[in-house]
């Protein structure tokens, strides 16, 4: 426990929260270019081939971003929009690619939760 005299000499430092998505540099999203599009396997109890892309952002960071939804049209040199949000069973993947913007098309034949996958309303 500090004394009043110690507090007068040196004030308490506020706790600074560390950001979970440093590559975005306090922006909601960032544009980037795909360097490599590949699949990777998740952590222990799960089994799948998760689609991810290595993206070079305009903030000059290079990050691994998850491609949500079924099927995608991404390849090398595709321009994508990246948002924060980790994938719990993929270590090191702390970003998501936004579907339906720039070079990324929305998920085909999606009827529920369409806004999350950039799909237009079916006629």
From Swiss-Prot:
Biological process, per Gene Ontology: translation
GO cellular component: chloroplast; small ribosomal subunit
This protein's record includes keyword Ribosomal protein: yes
Keyword Membrane: no
Lineage top rank: taxon: Eukaryota
UniProt-listed Pfam families: Ribosom_S12_S23
UniProt-annotated location(s): Plastid, Chloroplast
Keywords for the protein's UniProt record, in alphabetical order: Chloroplast, Plastid, Ribonucleoprotein, Ribosomal protein, RNA-binding, rRNA-binding
Major localization class: plastid
Molecular function terms from GO: rRNA binding; structural constituent of ribosome
Role summary: With S4 and S5 plays an important role in translational accuracy. Located at the interface of the 30S and 50S subunits.
Sequence similarity: Belongs to the universal ribosomal protein uS12 family.
HAMAP family: Ribosomal_uS12_B
Subunit structure: Part of the 30S ribosomal subunit.
NCBIfam families: rpsL_bact (TIGR00981)
Protein name as catalogued: Small ribosomal subunit protein uS12c
């Amino acid at each position: 426990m500090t004394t009043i005299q110690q507090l007068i000499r040196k004030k308490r430092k506020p706790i600074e929260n560390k950001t979970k998505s440093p590559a975005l540099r306090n922006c909601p999203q960032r544009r980037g270019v795909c360097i490599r599009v590949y699949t990777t396997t998740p952590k222990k109890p799960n089994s799948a081939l998760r689609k991810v892309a290595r993206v070079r952002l305009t903030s000059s960071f290079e990050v691994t971003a998850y491609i949500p939804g079924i099927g995608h049209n991404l390849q090398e040199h595709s321009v994508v929009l990246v948002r924060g949000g980790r994938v719990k069973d993929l270590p090191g993947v702390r970003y998501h690619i936004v579907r339906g913007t720039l070079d990324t098309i929305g998920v085909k034949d999606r009827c529920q939760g369409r806004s999350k996958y950039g799909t237009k309303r079916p006629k």
